[in-house]
Amino acid sequence: TVEHPYGSSAFLNAFLGGNNVLNQQYTGERYVWQPYRSVENFFRSGSVSNTSLNIRGASEDGKISYNVNYGNLDEEGFTPGNGLKRNNLSVGGRAQLSNKFTVQGSMNYSNTSFVSPPVAASRGNGTLGWSTFGNVFFTPRNVDLMGLPYTIPENGGSIYYRNGNDIINPNWSVANAQGGQTVNRINSTTSLTYEFNDNLSLTYRYGLDWYNERNKEYSN
């Protein structure tokens, strides 16, 4: 065994003059020096669920037809706090009118939402940014990532094995920080055709492409 990383932490020894819960709890504690499965236990098995529904129909004479499509994608990434959700709705139709006019149109609406814990380049020392992946992979094998407390009780901040607490605990990142993006988009086309005769027609087309994107980054 070796001295517990929180018991020998210069950061905890100095924080509030050493009068803090973790310093008092782990000072003098011993820590089993052995390999831990920190990387394997931090990540999880991902999953993907895809659902689709289609409805279509037409009149007996074939002059009117329609179709409706709905799709749902729910993806859970192998990194905790990472996921993607998407909903799509498409509607289309065509009507051949008795006065030589034909109207047809389609509309597609999609909503996509993506979330992820902080990701950045990493040197394992916090100087290039805040990287959940980097902080996991730079964790030594003899440090039990999943067995160490990750929150400082007094202020809710991150605590990790480094003597100076100079990188963010990946478990704290997942619980307290997130980046995300939500995108809404609408595409639609409409056309109106007038047939003068079998060889001549006039068509008017209108298209719309509307896009809205919102990004968020937060940390407690």
State each model region's role.
Residues 1, 23-54, 69-79:
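Short strand-turn segments of transmembrane beta-barrel domains in outer membranes
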Residues 1-33, 77-82, 88-185, 203-220:
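Surface-exposed loop/interface segments of Gram-negative outer-membrane beta-barrel transport/assembly proteins
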Residues 39, 173-177, 192:
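Short coil/turn segments at secondary-structure junctions
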Residues 48, 60-62, 96-98, 195-197:
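Outer-membrane beta-barrel channels and translocator barrels
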Residues 48-50, 88, 187:
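Short beta-strand-initiation
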Residues 53-57, 91-95, 188-194:
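Residues on the lipid-exposed face of transmembrane beta-strands in outer-membrane beta-barrel proteins
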Residues 57-63, 72:
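A generic beta-sheet turn/junction motif
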Residues 61-66, 100-103, 199-202:
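Repeated loop/turn-to-beta-strand initiation elements of outer-membrane beta-barrel proteins
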